[in-house]
Amino acid sequence: MILQKRVAGVSERGLERFVLRARRAAGVQGRVNVLVTGSAAVRSLNRGFRSHDKATDVLSFPSALPAAGSHAGSLLAGEIAISADIAVQNAMRLGHSVAEEIKILTLHGMLHLAGFDHERDNGQMARKEEKLRRALRLPAALIERAGRAQEPRVQPRKRRMA
């Protein structure tokens, strides 16, 4: 666990405990490293690995390599990078704590490490994310929020006066 950017209400110990719970819930085998950093660092990672020159809230990097210094058979499942800056903005906009937002982003990244891909799986990751965030007692997760933002807003019809 690396907290490069300190965030009020978020401790390494608390995040480590949540990562273990989320890893088990998502069925991820192996160790997961989580980096909480600033938007500039996440933008650099996004540009370097995905050719997207912009900051984003969370990135996941699956790995099948043995963890450094580990016993044979111990694998590094992958790494998750979270923008603390975007987490703070999201939490303020959505009315929940930054700690909850970082947990939501961690869960989303964990599901990517488990092999889910919301861009290609016809809603499978969205259903799993909703189920797990409810079990982990978290506010609405990323895919749910994106779905709500894309839903067409139906205007109520005006009644005609007779």
Regions from the PLM with identified roles:
Residues I104-L105:
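Conserved SAM/SAH cofactor-binding pocket of Class I
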